[in-house]
Regions:
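Protein-protein interaction/assembly regions in multi-subunit complexes
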Residues: 1-189, 194-213, 217-238, 242-264, ...
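Extended C-terminal regions of large enzymes
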Residues: 149, 156-160, 164-186, 190-626
């Protein structure tokens, strides 16, 4: 059953720690993830704080379900006000740290203030110690972790670490875990750096035992059979998310040349199967997960196994976005971003923007420190990434701000080349071919994100598809062609599946195992998991409401800062026509987009003019206190 949440508060200014408990009845409404993070921020922090000031909170939180050995769960969330978007910031990471945060007795760790000098926090049960990090400061993530092992005298920890990008307040700095996993997007690594906090290290703990072992076993005993019967899972295990390169290229919606085209010549050289054939040496997994989607590559002189390997978004942003077909350069860029602690989507997309601006004469060699930045090559990736991470005067400092702010500074039409929402660069899924994502990208509370709603192809599957595991929840939608216009059906699909994804983010679940379509587990399994693990009697309706509550809390946080419908917009390139491989010209019109936005707001119970949740919606979700 749900217990009180234990929250560790760490005041870095005063170098003090204390534990508070949150009543279990309140915790049930905000059970982990950024639902809990947003509850704390809305209750205890002024939304108008500078994201890089000591007043901004940095909250690490886990789900009450964390630490049980089942596929696709035990993800850790980080919440703060984002320096990239200026909105509520949110990020999840897999790997192994969440179970040990929970195993040490904490549901959340809240950092406030700013340390006078670099420090890290070490947790071993009830002992939470702020330790000196002078030796680690300035080091890349792998070296810093080794120095933490040395400082503690053992390596029985899991850690979250920033690299030089976080220390230098790069707007899209990541918080890295196990050198190859990231709390990415939103620049939360810069928030950590602004506090002079180099790392969070937690002592490893035993695996939790479920409340009902026999019931729990019904979910795990046949996992291999479930996987073998699911083509999507088999493909994910084989080639990782990199398999999306060939899937998108086959139909002509692989974002290329900074989103001017839907296909890159030579894309086969960057495909998932090419990575598997040329460079893959291992597949890694997260806590308790059988899917093993993580790539581990070895590229002599360019990429070491300890920094993992690229997944689809990285393979696209440093590949087709830049017109680059050299997979070894992509692997090298991925390693450098992991070492320096930077988001590969924003970094690659910002470099692609710079190439676009250079080719159009907006940037010159005087702006780029002499580099000729043209589509078709990754030769300058290393120099650019290092300059960005270190905020080196010139092109490094400019691109460290992200493409939107860089364009604002440059002017001369550079803004028209930016592909971002709320200043966060787009992931590699084209809205001309997945129109529902146009709505999701626009309304998403922390900028464009491809993992905040289901994608349009789910609407093409017959409802009797054996891999369709959420039939009762998705049967209300009309089957439609993913290349169709953006209409009311797509807007409804965006809202309903956004609630599911929000629920998953709250409970620390991974979309590859628990997503709304073609995945390993379904809604009945989730309810069973809650019961079997912690004796939580719940329903899919309660869990969906938790997901919606999280969305609305984020929306209200943003509203307090002044974000409205005007900020739920599309970049100019989103409205460009794209010709697919079948010869169809696909395009979203501004009229279709605005009408779909109206529909979304109606389904969500938000005011159509302002985009702010209505009082009735707040009351229904128990959020009148906001």
């Amino acid at each position: 059953m749900m217990e009180n949440a234990r929250i560790l508060y760490v005041d870095l200014t005063k170098r003090s720690t204390m534990v508070k408990e949150l009543d279990k009845e309140i915790y049930r409404k905000y059970p982990g993830g950024s639902a809990l993070g947003m509850y704390i921020m809305l209750k205890e922090m002024d939304a108008e704080v500078d994201p890089l000031s000591p007043e901004n909170m940095l909250i690490f939180s886990v789900s009450p379900l964390a630490g049980f050995p089942i596929s696709g769960q035990s993800r850790m969330n980080v919440t703060a006000k984002s320096p990239l978007t200026g909105t509520a910031g949110d990020s999840q990471v897999g790997g192994y740290i969440a179970p040990h945060v929970k195993g040490n007795g904490y549901d959340a760790i809240v950092f406030t203030g700013k340390s006078e000098k670099p420090v890290y926090l070490y947790i071993d049960g009830d002992q939470a110690e702020i330790r000196d990090a002078a030796k680690m400061w300035g080091k890349v993530t792998g070296e810093a972790e080794d120095l933490i092992f040395e400082d503690l005298g053992h390596n029985k920890i899991e850690s979250s670490i920033i690299g030089p990008a976080g220390e230098n307040l790069v707007k899209y700095a990541n918080i890295m875990h196990q050198r190859s996993r990231a709390n990415g997007r939103n620049g939360l690594g810069a928030v950590m750096g602004s506090k002079n906090l180099k790392a969070l290290a937690v002592k490893k703990t035993p695996t939790r035992k479920p409340a009902d072992r026999e019931l729990f076993k019904t979910l795990t005993i046949n996992v291999k059979e479930r996987m073998a019967a699911n083509e999507t899972i088999v493909s994910t295990t084989q080639d990782g998310s990199g398999g999306c390169v060939e899937g998108h290229a086959a139909e002509g919606f692989l974002p290329s040349y900074n989103w001017d085209k839907g296909l890159m010549d030579g894309w086969e050289n960057t495909a998932g199967y090419t990575l598997t054939e040329k460079y893959l040496i291992n597949r890694e997994t997260c806590f308790g997960c059988a899917i093993r989607c993580k790539r581990v590559v070895d590229v002599p002189g360019k990429a070491e196994p300890k920094y993992g390997g690229p997944e689809y978004e990285t393979m696209s942003t440093f590949g087709s976005y830049c017109g680059n077909t050299d997979l070894s350069d992509i692997c090298h860029a991925n390693q450098l971003c992991n070492m320096y602690g930077m988001d590969t989507i924003s970094c690659g997309a910002t470099i692609a923007w710079a190439m676009d601006a250079f080719e159009k004469g907006i940037l010159t060699t005087e702006d780029t420190d002499g580099m000729v930045l043209k589509f078709g090559s990754g030769e300058h990736f290393e120099e650019l990434i290092k300059k960005i991470a270190n905020r080196q005067t010139g092109i490094g400092a400019l691109l460290a701000e992200g493409s939107a702010r860089a364009a604002e500074k440059i002017g001369k039409g550079a803004e028209d080349l930016v592909v971002a929402n709320k200043k966060q660069e787009w992931p590699a899924h084209m809205v001309q071919f997945k129109p529902n994502l146009a709505v999701n990208y626009a309304v998403n509370n922390f900028g464009a994100d491809h993992q905040s709603s289901e994608h349009d192809p789910a609407l093409m599957a017959p409802k009797d598809d054996q891999n369709w595991i959420w039939p009762n929840q998705l049967a209300e939608f009309e089957d439609c062609d993913r290349y169709g216009v953006l209409d009311d059906n797509k807007a409804k699909f965006a809202f309903v599946t956004q609630k599911f994804y929000s629920m998953m983010d709250t409970l620390g679940l991974c979309q590859f195992a628990w997503g709304p379509a073609w995945q390993l587990y379904g809604p009945d399994d989730l309810v069973t998991f809650c019961k079997a693990s912690i004796d939580w009697d719940t329903s899919i309706d309660e869990l969906q409401e938790i997901g919606e509550r999280r969305l609305v809390m984020m929306r209200m946080f943003n509203a307090k800062i002044g974000f409205t419908r005007k900020d739920d917009n599309m970049p100019k390139k989103a409205f460009l026509p794209i010709t697919d491989t079948a010869g169809n010209v696909d395009q979203i019109t501004e009229e279709e987009f605005e009408a779909a936005l109206d529909s979304y707001y109606r389904y969500a119970g938000w005011d159509i003019k302002t985009g702010v949740p209505k009082k009735a919606t707040l009351d229904r979700l128990g959020l009148a206190w906001i």
